[in-house]
Amino acid sequence: MAKQQSKRPQAADERDDGLREKMVAINRVTKVVKGGRILGFAALTVVGDGDGGVGMGKGKSREVPVAVQKAMDEARRKLKKISLKNGTLQHAIVGKHGAASVLMQPAPSGTGIIAGGPMRAVFEVMGVTDVTCKCLGSANPYNVVRATLNGLLAINTPAEIAAKRGKSVEEILG
């Protein structure tokens, strides 16, 4: 079966808890059994707080709304905090997962989010306003989102780098 993704852009919804939700992909999957085929759906979503918090979830079910709800719930449970600097990243970083590699670079104010599909959804929900990204290798939405999150979680703040080197933050930023 061919993979199907929702082609229409999804607005980042805000529910009563103040979190932004975005659907990245929905795939129709089939299980072949003795009596025929069983159709199902797999949803991939990201949730963020608009201030550096982001989580990813996937859900599977026989119906789309149930799969999406399961994915949203998992994304809320897996929310992680990433330190940002003036709406962009602290430094350039490469994230990897499987065959997907994602190169992320901070950008000056006013640049906007220059990123494709799944990466853009991650940055929009977490509150990044200026970033430049390039996806290398696999374009599988799940692997691209995981690679993006792996890279973001590996970002070090100037204070962390200074502590590792035994220097002050002013010496690091020089």
Curated annotation (Swiss-Prot):
Keywords annotated in UniProt: Ribonucleoprotein, Ribosomal protein, RNA-binding, rRNA-binding
Signal peptide span: none
Source superkingdom: Bacteria
Gene Ontology biological-process entries: translation
Residue ranges of every copy of the S5 DRBM domain listed in the record: 19-82
GO molecular function: rRNA binding; structural constituent of ribosome
A Pfam family this chain is assigned to: Ribosomal_S5
Matches recorded under PROSITE patterns: RIBOSOMAL_S5 (PS00585), S5_DSRBD (PS50881)
GO cellular component: small ribosomal subunit
Record note on domains: The N-terminal domain interacts with the head of the 30S subunit; the C-terminal domain interacts with the body and contacts protein S4. The interaction surface between S4 and S5 is involved in control of translational fidelity.
Subunit-structure text: Part of the 30S ribosomal subunit. Contacts proteins S4 and S8.
Biological role stated in the UniProt entry: With S4 and S12 plays an important role in translational accuracy. Located at the back of the 30S subunit body where it stabilizes the conformation of the head with respect to the body.
PANTHER family xrefs: MITOCHONDRIAL RIBOSOMAL PROTEIN S5
Family membership: Belongs to the universal ribosomal protein uS5 family.
Protein name: Small ribosomal subunit protein uS5
Organism: Aromatoleum aromaticum (strain DSM 19018 / LMG 30748 / EbN1) (Azoarcus sp. (strain EbN1))
Gene: rpsE
